Each structure stands twice: as C-alpha cells, then as structure tokens.
Amino acid sequence: MNNNLQRDAIAAAIDVLNEERVIAYPTEAVFGVGCDPDSETAVMRLLELKQRPVDKGLILIAANYEQLKPYIDDTMLTDVQRETIFSRWPGPVTFVFPAPATTPRWLTGRFDSLAVRVTDHPLVVALCQAYGKPLVSTSANLSGLPPCRTVDEVRAQFGAAFPVVPGETGGRLNPSEIRDALTGELFRQG
C-alpha cells in the first residue's frame, strides 16, 4: 500500500476509533478487531460483536512498550525477566503482566492481569503511533468461524460497511504465543 493510501486509511480508522467504534486491521497472522482500550462503550461493542464474555479479558497491542505502561504493573519484574520480554518484542509474542487496580475491568475481565504485545506489524505500529495509545486486539471472526486472513473475509463475516484498514497480514500461520511475564509459563502456543 503506498504511503498516501496508508495514511488515509489510518486517518479514517482513527476517526472511527474516536467515535468509540470497532475497526479491523491486519496483524502478524490474522486480521484483528480492535478499539480504544479506554472506552468502555467501545470495548462493550467489540465484546458484543465477538459474542465474547467480558470476564475472559482482552489483549492490548501497541507500537512500543511506553504505550502499555499505564495499563500494566511491571514493578515485580526482575532484570532477567525484563530482558527476556524485550528480546521477544517487537514481535508476535503476547505477555501477561500484573495489572494495577486502575486498569479497567472491561480489559482485565476476572483477572488481576492483562495480556499485552508490542507488535512488529508496520501498519499496526503506524496505527498505534498515530492514535497515541494501544488498541484492544482480538481475532477478527464471529463466534464459531475461523479468524479472517483477508479484507474480503472480514467483510464476508462482518458486512461490507465494516471499517477495515486494508493491508496484508504478517504471514504467520498461528496467532501470537501467549506467556506469563513473571514465570514464562506458556499459555498458548504461537
């Protein structure tokens, strides 16, 4: 996608996000749907769209670690744990961090932790940088259907008018690996 088209697509996506609505965008493996993590209205719309219970918790995807810091508590990390995490970021590995009490329950669900990732997908990096914060990110698929890997698949599942940032996925076959930031325990194989 040329720079002007990408810039226009990102600007249009930010307009939708500012309206507390949900967008779709390519990630490392599949298309994701996401919204403003600070908007309970937007997150509830996303959960309703996905038919996902709020108690499961969500993932935030960001352009850089600084964008994630308001949502996580990294004070318990040792230098070795921090080095391990930073050696995997940016990239397709999601880490579950302790969450401070200020992190909204619509993000953490029933947990006192939050799953977060610093992406290396150039379009998502540009989107998060332009928006100035991370996005809620979950796979773009309706309950019971496979995750979307193309714009056409997103539109087939969510409708022709659904706001999609066009682009290619990163080509990975599987969604991101998920690990505990403190213990390194593998929750989901990537």
Swiss-Prot record:
Protein keywords = ATP-binding, Cytoplasm, Nucleotide-binding, Nucleotidyltransferase, Ribosome biogenesis, RNA-binding, rRNA processing, Transferase, tRNA processing, tRNA-binding
Q: Which GO terms describe its molecular function?
A: ATP binding; double-stranded RNA binding; L-threonylcarbamoyladenylate synthase; nucleotidyltransferase activity; tRNA binding
Q: Which SUPFAM superfamilies does this chain map to?
A: YrdC/RibB
EC number, as in UniProt: 2.7.7.87
What would be one Gene Ontology cellular-component term for the protein?
cytoplasm
Under the heading InterPro entries, the entry gives:
DHBP_synth_RibB-like_a/b_dom, Sua5-like_dom, TC-AMP_synthase, TC-AMP_synthase_SUA5
Q: How does it assemble?
A: Interacts with TsaB and TsaD.
The task this protein performs is described as: Required for the formation of a threonylcarbamoyl group on adenosine at position 37 (t(6)A37) in tRNAs that read codons beginning with adenine. Catalyzes the conversion of L-threonine, HCO(3)(-)/CO(2) and ATP to give threonylcarbamoyl-AMP (TC-AMP) as the acyladenylate intermediate, with the release of diphosphate. Is also able to catalyze the reverse reaction in vitro, i.e. the formation of ATP from TC-AMP and PPi. Shows higher affinity for the full-length tRNA(Thr) lacking only the t(6)A37 modification than for its fully modified counterpart.
| Protein name from the UniProt record | Threonylcarbamoyl-AMP synthase
Species whose genome carries this gene = Escherichia coli (strain K12)
Question: What gene is this protein a product of?
Answer: tsaC
